[in-house]
Design a protein with these regions (language model features):
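Active-site metal-binding loops of divalent metal-dependent hydrolases
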Residues: 11-15, 43-47, 99-101, 150-152, ...
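N-terminal active-site segment of His-dependent metallophosphoesterases
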Residues: 1-80
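Short acidic-hydrophobic surface loop/beta-edge motif
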Residues: 1, 137-143, 188-190
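Conserved beta-sheet core of the metallophosphoesterase superfamily
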Residues: 145-243
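Hydrophobic/aromatic residues located in beta-strands of well-ordered beta-sheets
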Residues: 39, 93-95, 200
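A short acidic (Asp/Glu
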Residues: 19-21, 49-53, 104-109, 158-159, ...
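Active-site neighborhood of divalent metal-dependent phosphoester bond hydrolases
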Residues: 51-136
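Conserved acidic residues
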Residues: 37-39, 91, 144, 174-175
Length: 253
């Protein structure tokens, strides 16, 4: 009998009150059809632009930011929409919190009087809907493979650059699945020793097809929009399939 794990990984969704949530229906329908053993959302489920440090509140852009609870209510709406179309409460589901969820922690850190209040709203959004969570930078292990929003280097910073998967593979001692850069990549690095190799999969993002966030519109992007289906056994990622958001929309929209 096959004893591996079939896992659907949803990349950075960057939910916002200003972006259509239709993609959560399509993803939910796909998950309902394929019935995986686990569902992982790799973090940055919500953008939390209300807490952005890049637009100061005194600036024109800052004055137009939504309230924190507007972002929270949008996040909760997207979670409920996804779960509605998954329509299967038996599948374990987990979120590895990302740097955009970390905005909530950073904001609270600067205002001691509200310590715990905003984090509770964030955590309850997931926990009350049966999504477990792990902290930013922490690994969630399934079948010997580590899942995290983005691995952190020796300086506590995210691995980055054009070939960050190669850098991660150089330092990793087990297979890793992550997101953050919005680019789907699958890198297998040979190793000396019993494990023989490590495999690093970057799952891209789960934004609408061809949607680029405002902060990156003039950047070098090469983003990948979709979800990833993984097969894990013998402590390795053995299968990796990228399903584009365009295909999901055509099939389930």
């Amino acid at each position: 009998m096959f004893k591996g794990h079939r896992i659907i990984v949803i990349g950075d969704a960057h939910d916002s009150p200003h972006i259509s949530q239709d993609r959560f229906k399509w993803i939910g329908k796909y998950i309902n059809q394929c019935e995986p053993d686990y569902i992982i959302q790799i973090g940055d489920w919500g953008s939390f632009d209300s807490l952005s440090f890049f637009q100061k509140n005194s600036s024109q852009a800052g004055k137009l930011k939504d309230a924190f609870m507007v972002d929270i209510n949008s996040l909760r709406s997207s979670i409920k929409l996804l779960d509605k179309y998954i329509d299967n409460n038996r599948i374990p589901r987990h979120v590895t919190l990302g740097n955009h969820e970390q905005r909530v922690y950073r904001f609270e850190e600067n205002i001691p009087e509200i310590a715990g209040m905003m984090k509770k709203e964030l955590h309850d959004s997931f926990l009350l809907n049966n999504w477990k969570i792990s902290s930013y930078g922490e690994f969630k292990y399934i079948g010997g493979v580590g899942f995290t929003h983005c691995p952190l280097n020796i300086m506590g910073k995210e691995y980055g650059g054009k070939n960050c998967e190669v850098q991660i593979a150089n330092d990793a001692t087990n297979d890793i699945v992550f997101g953050h850069t919005h680019k789907y990549r699958d890198w297998k690095a040979p190793k000396i020793g019993d494990k023989n190799y490590v495999r690093i999969v970057n799952v891209g993002c789960a934004l609408p097809f061809n949607h680029v966030e405002d902060y990156a519109k003039l950047n070098l992007t090469g983003w990948s929009w979709g979800i990833v289906e993984l097969g894990i056994w013998e402590n390795h990622i053995q299968e990796s399939q990228f399903i584009s958001m365009d295909r999901l929309e055509k099939q389930y929209g």
